[in-house]
């Protein structure tokens, strides 16, 4: 990078708390932790670890944090470990606890920013696993703009039962099968026990793996690191190398906002489209771009979708898991295909100091013939990307649908209206939803939920009952990366602020049309105007605590559901 970005000293920030007579009390605190006088002048590097025994996604992070700390020390830096929280989507799913998931994204970003800036750290390594660790950590990196790198905790390996690979979504779908009488109780219990065999994040191209792949494409994580399994030795080696790379970035003055540019975000979103990634990536990259002060809208996703095909056959709508993608060449192989087709910006710089083109220089031009995970651009799974932005009188600000793999790209049917996920789930489990229905779940948006719960439980139950292709679902909430089917989320404006989804009545005709990118309430304008005049805003569900704060400050989902948009 250019000289103006290079710090005069590698401890340019931390010297504020280590240098001079007035900082003797500060140094005394460091001596208490084993620092020596020769350590002052070395960069202080935060290691923000989301390790916990809350979830398998994060239960294997401590060895990575220890490895990073040791490698930082060897590279001449002072590691400073601190924790950041996590909320398990898989455990909170379908309960009140899920309301805290998206909230935790903001808490994670705020907590890392607080420690990095409060302690004048010269750099930071963020180590995360579960879904919201990913955007929360990246938002903190670009907010603070101190040299930083993201170390993904790694994917879980698949479970196995009766010759079938399993993952966490297998269990959610098994619930629907069991309720429908299509699954033996013994098999149901064995799937439950075997689906998650150890530590690591959920194994398909679900939200955590989507974001890790995107961070690699963004240039903020090392090549190949996003598809490694948590329990494999190469993940520890990659973590150590990440620490060494960060120390070099500190010396060069290479900062996150030098890397996370508009072009780099285009690269990341292109990889999300090519790999069939999660709808949550739309919400999270709106938030990351906002934190980085990069102009970015939901229409940018649609622009990229139209030119980037889906070339990776990944679950939930495909066949393979992240461990399979890793063996097939990982994200660098996918990026090489996109770069050679002119679909990536090769000049974007990465945390290594190399450009994207330089990083990919020695990657094979074509994927291996003996694998089926990565296709070529001449033989894609789908000619266009899968995350479509839909609009219509139900969602004038836009909403998100995952349209790949649908046998029936359109549905018009009677609305089955529910004012919470819980009410909808009760109806689904009671078998009151039938083929041709369009389920509307509202008051689950950023403000109304609050927290935009993910609707994996309802969608998986529908799939398990054999209704995944014949029932539509529309919500102002979100979907898990494991969701597939005729589903539309992030409907904006949300019901809580009087968005049109609040005006839908039981039995109204509703259309979802993926090809026309339309989500429409088939009711006349005059009738909708009458309903709008009669609508009254509901009382907040929470008046104290973190959920109340999030509800007060959260923006529309079309703006990323961020909490600092209009401060």
From Swiss-Prot:
Binds 1 [2Fe-2S] cluster per subunit. This cluster acts as a Lewis acid cofactor. It catalyses: (2R)-2,3-dihydroxy-3-methylbutanoate = 3-methyl-2-oxobutanoate + H2O; (2R,3R)-2,3-dihydroxy-3-methylpentanoate = (S)-3-methyl-2-oxopentanoate + H2O. Functions in the biosynthesis of branched-chain amino acids. Catalyzes the dehydration of (2R,3R)-2,3-dihydroxy-3-methylpentanoate (2,3-dihydroxy-3-methylvalerate) into 2-oxo-3-methylpentanoate (2-oxo-3-methylvalerate) and of (2R)-2,3-dihydroxy-3-methylbutanoate (2,3-dihydroxyisovalerate) into 2-oxo-3-methylbutanoate (2-oxoisovalerate), the penultimate precursor to L-isoleucine and L-valine, respectively. Homodimer. Pfam families: ILV_EDD_C (PF24877), ILVD_EDD_N (PF00920). InterPro entries: DHAD_IlvD/Edd, Dihydro-acid_dehy_C, DihydroxyA_deHydtase, DiOHA_6PGluconate_deHydtase_CS, ILV_EDD_C, ILV_EDD_N, IlvD/EDD_N. [2Fe-2S] cluster binds at residues 57, 130, 202. GO terms for molecular function: 2 iron, 2 sulfur cluster binding; dihydroxy-acid dehydratase activity; magnesium ion binding. Its EC number is 4.2.1.9. This is Dihydroxy-acid dehydratase 1. The modification N6-carboxylysine is found at residue 132. Belongs to the IlvD/Edd family. GO terms for biological process: isoleucine biosynthetic process; L-valine biosynthetic process. Mg(2+) binds at residues 89, 131-132, 454. Its cofactor is [2Fe-2S] cluster; Mg(2+). The active site is at 480 (proton acceptor). Keywords: 2Fe-2S, Amino-acid biosynthesis, Branched-chain amino acid biosynthesis, Iron, Iron-sulfur, Lyase, Magnesium, Metal-binding. Pathway: Amino-acid biosynthesis; L-isoleucine biosynthesis; L-isoleucine from 2-oxobutanoate: step 3/4; Amino-acid biosynthesis; L-valine biosynthesis; L-valine from pyruvate: step 3/4. PANTHER family: DIHYDROXY-ACID DEHYDRATASE DAD (PTHR21000), DIHYDROXY-ACID DEHYDRATASE, MITOCHONDRIAL (PTHR21000:SF5).
